[in-house]
Amino acid sequence: MTPSQVTFEIRGTLLPGEVFAMCGNCDALGNWSPQNAVPLTESETGESVWKAVIVLSRGMSVKYRYFRGCFLEPKTIGGPCQVIVHKWETHLQPRSITPLENEIIIDDGQFGIHNGVETLDSGWLTCQTEIRLRLHFSEKPPVSITKKKFKKSRFRVKLTLEGLEEDDDDDDKASPTVLHKMSNSLEISLISDNEFKCRHSQPECGYGLQPDRWTEYSIQTMEPDNLELIFDFFEEDLSEHVVQGDVLPGHVGTACLLSSTIAESERSAGILTLPIMSRSSRKTIGKVRVDFIIIKPLPGYSCSMQSSFSKYWKPRIPLDVGHRGAGNSTTTAKLAKVQENTIASLRNAASHGAAFVEFDVHLSKDLVPVVYHDLTCCLTMKRKYEADPVELFEIPVKELTFDQLQLLKLSHVTALKTKDQKQCMAEEENSFSENQPFPSLKMVLESLPENVGFNIEIKWICQHRDGVWDGNLSTYFDMNAFLDIILKTVLENSGKRRIVFSSFDADICTMVRQKQNKYPILFLTQGKSDIYPELMDLRSRTTPIAMSFAQFENILGINAHTEDLLRNPSYVQEAKDKGLVIFCWGDDTNDPENRRKLKEFGVNGLIYDRIYDWMPEQPNIFQVEQLERLKRELPELKNCLCPTVSHFIPPSFCMESKIHVDANGIDNVENA
C-alpha cells in the first residue's frame, strides 16, 4: 500500500505529568490498545497544540480516539510501557480519516469535542491500584474521643498522604526492576441526599463529619503497600478552651495508617480501628473506625478503546425487562409458570418481546459463575432410619461445587417453610435441561440469542441495619477475585450483546466501574420501604443518596424500588436531570396500572414478572429497530410485513448488499 504521512493536531490543557495520546484500529495506532497508543508532543508554538506524525496506508479508512493520561516506566527492563488513562473520548462513533494524499494535516480541534459534541469519560484501572478510605455513620459514629470535654463535640477530619522513603543502599546493585514514576493522587468526596462534592484539596482543618453524609478518600497509586496516611482531627465547634492564635486551632489529635497494614490483611474490604493520639501528650485519647476497600485492575485482560457504553444510553421508549427471566417462581403472590433464572425462563421472556432479561449471578465453591437468585439453597438429605425419607438442609451456594449444583437434588429455601418435599423432588431433569437451575453464566451467554440484552445482577451479601446478614453469611468471597471471575466471563463471551450490570452493594458498583471500560452498571436501591428491612449501608437507605452515589461514581444510573417511585414520582425526573438512567424493580411493577404510571413518569426500564401474561410472542424492540433500518436501506424490503428479519433475509443477501447485520441487530455503532 502507498504510504501517507498524516500530522494529527489536538488542542487542550494537561495536568503535570500528563500527555495526550491517540489510539486507533490499525497497527500504527495500537489496535485500540492504550498500552500501544501513540503519545503526542507539544507544538513549538506553545498554544496548547499537541501533534503526532503517523504513517498510514493511503486510501484505507482509519478510526481513532484521543485520551489524556500518563506513560510510566516499565516494571521491568525491556518490558511493556504502562499507561494510565485519566480521560478519554467515548463518542459512539470515533474520529475517522481516509488519507488520499502523500502528506496531510488533520486539525481535530479541541480534545473531547467531535462533530460539535463533547463526550469524555474517566479512565479505568490499567495498572494502578485504588484505595478507598471512608468515614461514615452507617453503624455508629466513626470517631470516638474518651475525654469528657469532647463528649458532645463534632469533628472535622483532614487526610494527608505521604509515600514512605525507601532504603537506597541497593541502588547500585544490578536489578531487572525499575521504579515507577507516578505521583499518588488523592480525591475527597462528600455524598449526601442533597448533593455530592469531589475535591482534590482540603480546607486547613479538613471537612466536618455529619451523620447523614458519607465521607470518602480515593487514592490511586502504583505502590499500595508503601503509603503513610495521616488523619488529623479538629473540634468543629471551637469553644473557650481552644487557645487563640494557635497554628492549628481546635486540633485534637492524630491517627496514622500504614497502607501495608491493609495489604497484609489480604482483604479487599474491611474496617480498621486506629488509635487517636493526643496532639500534646501523644497519649491515646480515642479511636477512629476506617472503612476501606482496595480496587485492583482486572488481571489477564486488557480493555479496548474501540467502544464504551459505560455512560451511554440511547433514548427509547421504556424497555420491558423480564425479572429472573419469565418471573419469580418462588416467593411472589402469583408464581411464574417456568422455574426462575433458568435458560428456559430467560428464553421464554425473550420470545415474548423482552428487551432485556434480568438474572442473578454469584460463584460456586469452585469459582464458576452461576445463575441463581438466593445465596442459599436446600439440599435433600435422606435419613438413615426414620420413616420420613428425606430432610431439607439449608446450605450456602458458595459451599457447593458447580458439578454438585448440577447433580444434587436441591430446592429453594421456601421449601423449608412449606415443608413441601414432593414439590422439591418433582423436577428430575438431567444436567443439560434448560429447566435445570444453576446454569453457568457462560452457558447462558452462549444459549440465548444476542438480540436480547442481559441485566446481570451481581449478588453480594448485604447487612441489614439490625445487624442481620443476607443468608446469615457474614463472610464471603474476596471481592476483587469474585468480580474478576465474573467480569472476565462476561467480557470474553458477550459478543455484541447489550449488557447492563447492577448490584445492591455500592462497592460492587464502584469496582465494576473501575475494573472495565465497556459495560454500564446501575446501583440497585430499595430506598424507603415498608416491605424490606433497612440496609446498614448509608448509601442504600434513600433513593436521593443513591442518585448522589451514582453521580459521584460516574456510573450509568440507579435501579430504584417501584414502591419508592410511586410514593415519590419526582425522583424519576430528578434522576434524569442529573444525567442518570433509571430502572425500576419490585412486586408493585407487576401491576399493569403501575407500569402505565411508571412509563408516564419516564423510567427507562421496568423489571417485572410474567411478561408472557402481557405480551404475545413477538420480536423485541431491538429486532424491530433492525428491521426498520433494513427496510429504509433496502427497497426490496419496504413492503415486507414479516415481523422478524431472519424470516425473510438470508445472510448472503446482506453481504451482497454490503450491509453488516450483527446478531444483536446493530448494523453500525450509531444504532446501539
Curated annotation (Swiss-Prot):
Entry's Gene Ontology molecular function annotations: glycerophosphocholine phosphodiesterase activity; starch binding
UniProt keyword annotations, A-Z: Cytoplasm, Hydrolase, Phosphoprotein
Gene3D superfamilies per record: Immunoglobulins, Phosphatidylinositol (PI) phosphodiesterase
Modified residues (Phosphotyrosine): 608
Modified residues (Phosphoserine): 175
EC numbers: 3.1.4.2
Residues the entry annotates as binding substrate: 68, 86-87
Record InterPro entries: Carb-bd-like_fold, CBM20, CBM20_GPCPD1, GDPD, GP_PDE_dom, Ig-like_fold, PLC-like_Pdiesterase_TIM-brl
Reactions accelerated catalytically: sn-glycerol 3-phosphocholine + H2O = sn-glycerol 3-phosphate + choline + H(+)
Ranges of residues in domain CBM20: 1-113
Role of this protein: May be involved in the negative regulation of skeletal muscle differentiation, independently of its glycerophosphocholine phosphodiesterase activity.
Entry similarity comment: Belongs to the glycerophosphoryl diester phosphodiesterase family.
Listed name of the protein: Glycerophosphocholine phosphodiesterase GPCPD1
Organism: Rattus norvegicus
Gene name, Swiss-Prot/TrEMBL: Gpcpd1
